[in-house]
Amino acid sequence: MAGAGLLLWCGIMLLPSAALAQDGSVILEADVDGRPVGVGNLVLDPSQTAKVSVTVRNNTTTVQRVKTVRISGTALALTFFSYDTTVPFDVPAKSSETRSFPLEPTDLGSQAIGLLPVTVEVIDVGRESIASVETTGDVKGSLWSVYGAFGLGVLVLTGLSWAGALIALARRRLPPNRWQRAMRFLPAGIGTGLVAVISLSVLRLVAPSPTAEIPFVVGAAAAAFVLGYLTPHPGERRHPSDVDTVRIQR
């Protein structure tokens, strides 16, 4: 049941959360190795040092005090890597400032792999986000990274959920109530959707985002729910007329 609970929790975490109100008058522009963030995929190779440049355009009437530049990657509402670089500078009102720094993601290979949503943001002295820009990152990591291991764990839990539900069906041990039988199959469906989302991400086909995650997870969960609902009552037996007769020779 712990595995089923984890799969249900992962599915719930896919629901889009309310966006925090942000001041749109502060704009962040960033580029990595001369390529603008937000144009195409951002390639992150742990074996190479990247040159990051950020430009903060302050259209407000107050000074913006930047302390940290953060680059993070998330999937399924979980953060799998985050790099904070201290680059303190002030951006006067109605002006812009640019800063550059090297990024050495040497341990990135053990944290993530494949396509992931990446956010570049500038943080003030109060640890609040001033502005951010989002893109899709192509992480050249290992299958045995934290993200890869997470996907393998979800795959194992999903297999166990399906095995438990199907074995209970074969042994006529499912609940007599249709809705309870449907709920018995639901975690397996959620897990199937999560496995599909993670697999597409690792194979660098589709990055995990709400528009990609929700259809897969909801669709697979609905299919499993319907399958469980339509399973026969565990107390049902075949009609005598349907039972095969065997002739005993004397």
Q: What do the predicted segments below correspond to?
A:
Residues 80-108:
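Intrinsically disordered, low-complexity Pro/Gly/Ser/Thr-rich segments with frequent PxxP/GP/PP motifs
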